[in-house]
């Protein structure tokens, strides 16, 4: 079964207004999906970054005025972090924007990636990359809860990684839309 068949019609149109609530800084991440293998590319951030060190994330980052719009932000950051050139990326639409704990209003943009693209990791920002199988993510037994700093968090357990926080919320939004 092709879980990606109806994805495009279940996404939001991309908001290019560059508006942010509460003066949060704007940011965009790319949710890169490999269509044939039905996998999502994720990164593990390096420990030397100023925010979210060592966490699992999508390629992306802060909006820069020279970007012009958030699609360009996501494309620029994806190329900087994992070396995927814009010609290999087909942006489909957006998921719901989210407020992050680091005071960013983050727009997750969903894109299909050419299967044969070669990753070129930026070691300053990305410690490693891995792929999450969409069909595995859809299994209820991979969406778990656990305690961290005396708080309960939901997370996905994938390839020996715990995917929690903003990345978990983005994946949950995506997976909910895939089930429609």
Describe these PLM feature segments.
Residues 1-57, 62-116, 126, 146, ...:
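N-terminal leader/linker segments that precede catalytic domains of diphosphate-processing enzymes
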Residues 124, 129-148:
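Amphipathic alpha-helical blocks and their helix-capping loop/short-beta junctions
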Residues 119-122:
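Short, solvent-exposed recognition segments
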């Amino acid at each position: 079964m092709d879980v990606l068949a109806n994805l495009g019609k279940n996404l939001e149109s991309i908001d290019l207004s560059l508006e942010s609530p509460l003066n949060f800084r704007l940011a965009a991440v790319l949710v890169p999906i490999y269509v044939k293998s039905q996998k999502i590319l994720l990164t593990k951030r390096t420990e030397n970054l100023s925010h979210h060190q060592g966490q699992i994330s999508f390629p992306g980052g802060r909006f820069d005025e020279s970007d012009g719009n958030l699609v360009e932000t996501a494309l620029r950051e994806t190329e900087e972090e994992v070396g995927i050139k814009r010609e290999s990326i087909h942006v489909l639409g957006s998921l719901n924007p989210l407020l992050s704990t680091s005071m960013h209003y983050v727009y997750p943009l969903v894109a299909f990636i050419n299967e044969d693209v070669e990753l070129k990791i930026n070691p300053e920002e990305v410690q490693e990359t891995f792929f999450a199988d969409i069909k595995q993510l859809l299994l209820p037994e991979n969406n778990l809860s656990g305690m961290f700093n005396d708080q309960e968090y939901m997370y996905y357990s994938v390839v020996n990684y715990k995917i929690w926080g903003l990345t978990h919320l983005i994946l949950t939004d995506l997976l909910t839309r895939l089930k429609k």
